[in-house]
Design a protein with these regions (language model features):
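Helix-to-loop junction immediately C-terminal to a conserved catalytic motif
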Residues: 51
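ABC-family P-loop ATPase nucleotide-binding domains
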Residues: 81-137
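Conserved structural motif at the start of ABC-family nucleotide-binding domains
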Residues: 4-6, 20
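Helical segment within the ABC ATPase nucleotide-binding domain
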Residues: 163-176
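Catalytic Walker B motif of ABC-type/P-loop ATPase nucleotide-binding domains
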Residues: 149-153, 158
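The feature captures the beta-strand-to-loop junction immediately N-terminal to the Walker
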Residues: 36-38
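Conserved ABC transporter NBD signature motif
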Residues: 59-72
Length: 232
C-alpha cells in the first residue's frame, strides 16, 4: 500500500463552519485504522478529503509523497456513508459497469461475496432492504484490488446480528498489503480488527494510539475509552 499522510489539514464549509481543524494523520501500508467520533465530529469530511471529493481549505494530503488527485483515486476504493447506486439497476449490471470502469475490479470476488451473503445478482436494488443495499455497495468496494479501502460507516445500516459476518467479509477480501480506513461510531463491533484508532471531536484529533497501547496503558477496551472520552 502507498503510505497516506495528512499534514495540518483543515476544512471549512461555505458560511465558515470549521468541520476539520489542523488534522495530521499517518497511515502505513497494511494497517487497519479507524477514525472514531460522534456524529458531526468531522469523520466524513476527513475521509472525503482523503478520497479527493473535497479539497482542504488548508494543509496537504499525500499518498506515497504524491498529492491526492486523479492518480491517487486509482489506488483508493471508497465506500461513502450514503448510497450512490441506481436503484433501478440489477446487481449483475452494476457489477458489469464496475468491471468496465475499474481496471482492478475482480468480478469473481464480487460474485463470491454475493454468494456468501446470499444476495441474488438478478435482483434490482429497489427491491432490497436498506441493509442489503449497503452490503451490495460494500461488495463493490471490496472487489477492487486497491491500496487503500476507505469505509465510511460500513456497518451502521446492517443488522447487529450480521455485523461480525460483514467484518469477516471485509477482512477476507482485501489486498494483504493494503490498508483499511474505517470511519465509525460503532467501536465495539470493529475493535478486534483494528491496529490503530484516531479519536476526533469537533474537527480536532483528541487521541491517536495503537489498540494494544490503549488496552495496556488505560486498562480498558477502545470502546470503553471512547465512551469515557465522549461521555456516552
Amino acid at each position: 500500500m502507498k503510505d497516506l499522510s495528512l499534514r495540518n489539514v483543515s476544512f471549512s464549509y461555505p458560511g465558515g463552519f470549521l468541520a476539520v481543524d489542523d488534522v495530521s494523520i499517518d497511515i502505513k501500508g497494511g494497517e487497519n485504522v479507524a477514525i472514531v467520533g460522534q456524529n458531526g465530529a468531522g469523520k466524513t469530511t476527513t475521509v472525503k478529503m482523503i478520497n479527493g471529493l473535497l479539497a482542504p481549505t488548508s494543509g496537504s494530503i499525500f499518498m506515497q509523497q504524491n498529492p491526492i488527485g486523479a492518480e491517487s483515486k486509482k489506488h483508493i476504493s471508497y465506500l461513502p456513508d450514503h448510497t450512490y447506486l441506481n436503484m433501478n439497476e440489477r446487481v449483475r449490471d452494476i457489477i458489469r459497469y464496475f468491471s468496465d470502469f475499474y481496471e482492478d475490479f475482480d468480478e469473481k470476488r464480487a460474485y463470491d461475496m454475493l454468494g456468501k451473503l446470499q444476495i441474488d445478482a438478478s435482483d434490482r436494488l429497489k427491491t432490497m432492504s436498506k441493509g442489503t443495499k449497503e452490503k451490495v455497495q460494500l461488495i463493490l468496494v471490496m472487489s477492487r484490488h486497491a491500496d487503500l479501502y476507505i469505509l465510511d460507516e460500513p456497518i451502521a445500516g446492517v443488522d447487529p446480528a450480521a455485523r461480525d459476518f460483514i467484518l469477516n467479509i471485509i477482512l477476507s477480501n482485501y489486498e494483504p498489503e493494503a490498508s483499511i480506513l474505517i470511519s465509525t461510531h460503532l467501536i465495539a463491533d470493529i475493535e478486534n480488527i483494528l491496529d490503530e484508532v484516531i479519536f476526533i471531536d469537533h474537527g480536532q484529533i483528541r487521541l491517536t494510539a495503537s489498540v494494544d497501547d490503549i488496552r495496556m496503558n488505560n486498562g480498558k477496551s477502545v470502546d470503553a475509552l471512547f465512551r469515557e472520552v465522549y461521555r456516552c
